[in-house]
Amino acid sequence: MLGKTQSQYIAYITDSLKWGGQVELNIMSSLFQVEIAAIDIQSGRIDTYGQGEQYSQRVYLLFTGIHFDAVVFDHSSGKRAVLPTDAKAKEAAQKLATSLQTQGKFTDQATMTLYCKVCGHVMKGDLEARTHAGASGHTEFAMKK
């Protein structure tokens, strides 16, 4: 998958320091027979995996620009992450995403400032970081605050 052999992909995706994206969200939607609505905090865009499959439940994720966080709703019957596919839950998840966007709780990978933990070189965005990694062999980066 994605340019890897099956064994390479399994090793990659089961590494606790790695995570998946669209492909894995599609797989999980099908496997668990639930819609997965991923809301991009920066843009407000919602990508819904499993849409049109007639699933009766939905899970909401917030995409920070770096990773996904599950949305858990606190109901009188307890905390729940899996909800009916109704407009009320969608509206609440969108409201949360809008609040986080207003607070700047997302990372813009194109404009974030990074530094190389090996040599200290400062870069703007993930493209410059990949270019630096290719030229120097350095692969340890951190966000500059």
Language-model region placement:
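Short Cys/His-rich metal-coordination motifs, predominantly Zn2+-binding knuckles/fingers
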Residues: 117-119
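Interface signal in eukaryotic adaptor modules for cytoskeleton, membrane trafficking
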Residues: 1-21, 27
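Short loop-to-beta-strand transition segments
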Residues: 1-3, 34-40, 141-144
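Short amphipathic alpha-helical segments embedded in low-complexity Lys/Glu-rich regions
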Residues: 1-8, 41-48, 131-136
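Residues that form generic nucleotide/phosphate-binding pockets
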Residues: 12, 31, 132
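C-terminal recognition-helix end and immediately following basic linker
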Residues: 111-112, 125-145
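Deubiquitinase catalytic domains
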Residues: 24-111, 121-128
